Amino acid sequence: MAPPLNVVLVNSKSDEPFNDEHRRLIAKISPLCYAYNYHLVLVNFRIDDSPTDFAREMATSTSIGKGGERLIELAKKGKIKITKLPLSEDLGKIVICTSKPDKTKSENPKNIFALSKKRKIALIFGCDKKRNKNIRNLLQKADYHLDISCKGIQLSVDAEMGAVTSIINNLE
């Protein structure tokens, strides 16, 4: 059995209150995590609730993922973690998903898939395209960088999350 794969959503602005943009992004990624049996890790969001309480609160404000039911089910299965930076080593090998990979850390989807079968990995996505100190530190400390387009094409965060999770899930 392959180790768990973590989808990590990072809010680069730790002082920013939880907002509708965050809510929509989390609502969009939760059905993907549910469908592919991935864990969801929310980093640097101002969330004080337990994962289950947070999921229940979110469910009332979304129609995505069967009205938030997928998010609640992930939480009940222990597949949602709410944490802060720096990232915990127990998330596994860090893979930054970016259209601007460092050439020395750049990997292709097939190699990331192969790694995911042997080791726990964390696919890191930023909530926005800003590269502040928090994101620069993550880029520097990451084990690998993944440009899912393999062409340096910048995608919206939700499109990138969908592409990365689907491609990694469907490779063999």
Over which residues does each language-model region extend?
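Short, aromatic/basic amphipathic alpha-helical patches
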Residues: 53-62, 110, 134-139
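Short, well-ordered alpha-helix to beta-strand connector turns
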Residues: 37, 91-92, 119, 139-142
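Structured adenosyl-cofactor binding patch, chiefly the S-adenosyl-L-methionine
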Residues: 133-172
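RNA substrate-binding interface of SAM-dependent RNA methyltransferases
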Residues: 2-99, 169
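Long, charge-patterned amphipathic alpha-helical coiled-coil/hairpin "stalk" segments used as oligomerization
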Residues: 98-138
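Short, Lys/Arg-enriched, disordered terminal segments
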Residues: 1-4, 112-113, 117-118, 172
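Well-ordered, non-membrane alpha-helical segments in soluble/globular domains
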Residues: 22-28, 106-110, 161
